[in-house]
């Protein structure tokens, strides 16, 4: 019985109780959210010792870290190292996006070495194996694709990105649209390429009920991928993107009817003035399903700093109602990320998530900032470091130019707070 089915029977599962405790909310709230489909708990029934994570309405904004090999770089060991860094930096979930050699070994090692929910894009495995077996990715069969999905579900994968909304009709809309960057989603490109080669409908759409059967058996959460997400801000919110979203809205309803948990993925590259509209559109079309966004990146001209462009967009998106941020690293658009890139990406997205949680009124979010203000007024450095989002980095930065007095090295003897306390009689009790 899936979490969704139990919630509809008003059964509060241990997982729902755990999420309620983490979020500081009543278990009944979590149960109702799962039943309504606006909260998901990605948790394959075969996973053991899983650190549960609730994603959706009324909960804190979550952050995902992508890792994985490419055809040119990456090993099992390198990806496990990135995994550990992502965990240390505070990621809530992990996705393995491997496309390189030993693709199965990488995924299995990640599963073995993490207690965080793990997501994948199964078409990557199917494409890699088809290239090895048949000489070309497009020669994979529908059975190959569903076999990859089922084998990963049996291993314990908690959520899968599937590009079900890339239909023949949507492809026609895309062709008529005219884009600067065409299709930038690998999964979307694999799917569209297969459809054109075979002159056939997307098997994930045509056989969506089969996909639901697999997910229901293992309680795998569906993450409906946006294969036609915009790859530059000039392509944002175009007809192709919206056409796919309309299909995803229909599939959300079918997944819920099948008692399968489902969330929806979103753009992408979006200028600041279009982000809120994108969130509102998705929430309306997809009936308040949890929204999982990549960034969004708000400008295209900052390679090497796209963790910042993604954090800017992520903060605006989450404040407007997005529930789940996929991190962006400084290596985006340039290379495979290394361990340092992973850390910086997670931290940047966590800052965005927290900033949005203050706006959302998430339990404890604003209070943490209030406590930081009090600690700063007191020049209480231990408390400031403990309250900081990245205590290790904060301590290293402070220790670079440590002064003799209580103030930091920026102001020294001219610390505004210390002078106000001394000469104006302004005490910390006013904070």
Swiss-Prot record:
- Keyword vocabulary terms for this entry: 4Fe-4S, Iron, Iron-sulfur, Lyase, Metal-binding, S-adenosyl-L-methionine, Thiamine biosynthesis, Zinc
Q: Which residues form a coiled coil?
A: none
InterPro entries in the record: ThiC, ThiC/Bza_core_dom, ThiC/BzaA/B
- One Pfam family cited in the UniProt record for this chain: ThiC_Rad_SAM
* Residue sites binding substrate per the record: 66, 95, 124, 163, 185-187, 226-229, 265, 292
| Cofactor(s) this protein requires | [4Fe-4S] cluster
Q: Write out the pathway annotation from the protein's UniProt entry.
A: Cofactor biosynthesis; thiamine diphosphate biosynthesis
Q: Does the keyword RNA-binding apply?
A: no
Instruction: Report the cofactor remark.
Output: Binds 1 [4Fe-4S] cluster per subunit. The cluster is coordinated with 3 cysteines and an exchangeable S-adenosyl-L-methionine.
Reaction catalysed? 5-amino-1-(5-phospho-beta-D-ribosyl)imidazole + S-adenosyl-L-methionine = 4-amino-2-methyl-5-(phosphooxymethyl)pyrimidine + CO + 5'-deoxyadenosine + formate + L-methionine + 3 H(+)
Q: Which residues bind Zn(2+)?
A: 269, 333
Do the record's keywords include S-adenosyl-L-methionine?
yes
GO BP annotations, alphabetical order: thiamine biosynthetic process; thiamine diphosphate biosynthetic process
Q: What does this protein do?
A: Catalyzes the synthesis of the hydroxymethylpyrimidine phosphate (HMP-P) moiety of thiamine from aminoimidazole ribotide (AIR) in a radical S-adenosyl-L-methionine (SAM)-dependent reaction.
Question: What's the name of the protein?
Answer: Phosphomethylpyrimidine synthase
| Organism whose genome encodes this protein | Dehalococcoides mccartyi (strain ATCC BAA-2266 / KCTC 15142 / 195)
């Amino acid at each position: 019985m899936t979490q969704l089915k139990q919630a509809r029977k008003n059964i509060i599962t241990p997982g729902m109780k755990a999420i309620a405790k983490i979020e500081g909310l009543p278990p009944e709230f979590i149960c109702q959210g799962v039943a309504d489909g606006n909260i998901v708990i990605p948790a394959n029934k075969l996973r053991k010792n899983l650190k549960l994570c609730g994603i959706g309405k009324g909960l804190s904004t979550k952050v995902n870290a992508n890792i994985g090999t490419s055809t040119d770089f990456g090993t099992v060991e390198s990806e496990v190292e990135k995994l550990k860094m992502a965990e240390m930096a505070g990621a809530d979930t992990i996705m393995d996006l491997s496309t390189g050699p030993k693709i199965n070994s990488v995924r299995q090692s990640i599963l073995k070495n993490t207690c965080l929910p793990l997501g994948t894009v199964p078409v990557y495995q199917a494409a890699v194996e088809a290239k090895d077996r048949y000489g070309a990715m497009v020669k994979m069969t529908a059975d190959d694709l569903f076999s990859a999905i089922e084998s990963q579900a049996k291993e314990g994968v908690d959520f899968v990105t599937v590009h079900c909304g890339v239909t023949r009709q949507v492809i026609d809309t895309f062709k008529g649209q005219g884009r600067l960057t065409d299709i930038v989603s690998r999964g979307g490109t694999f799917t569209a390429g297969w459809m054109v080669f075979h002159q056939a409908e997307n098997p994930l759409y045509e056989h969506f009920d089969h996909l639901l059967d697999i997910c229901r058996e293992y309680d795998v959460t569906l993450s409906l991928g946006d294969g036609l997400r915009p790859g530059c801000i000039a392509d944002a919110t175009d007809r192709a993107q919206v056409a796919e979203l309309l299909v995803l809205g229909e599939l959300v309803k079918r997944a819920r009817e099948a008692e399968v948990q489902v969330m929806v993925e979103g753009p992408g590259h979006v200028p600041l003035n279009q982000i809120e509209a994108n969130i509102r559109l998705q929430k309306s079309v997809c009936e308040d399903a949890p929204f999982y966004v990549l960034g969004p990146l708000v400008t295209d001209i900052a390679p090497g700093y796209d963790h910042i462009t993604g954090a800017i967009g992520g903060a605006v998106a989450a404040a407007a109602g997005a529930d789940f941020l996929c991190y962006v690293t400084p290596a985006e658009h340039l290379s495979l990320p290394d361990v340092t890139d992973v850390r910086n990406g997670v931290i940047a997205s966590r800052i965005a998530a927290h900033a949005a949680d203050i706006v959302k009124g998430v339990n404890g979010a604003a209070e943490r900032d209030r406590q930081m203000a009090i600690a700063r007024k007191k020049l209480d450095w231990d408390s400031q470091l403990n309250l900081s989002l990245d205590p290790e980095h904060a301590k290293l930065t402070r220790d670079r130019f440590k002064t003799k007095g209580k103030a930091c090295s920026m102001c020294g003897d001219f610390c505004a707070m210390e002078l106000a306390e001394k000469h104006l009689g302004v005490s910390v009790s006013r904070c």
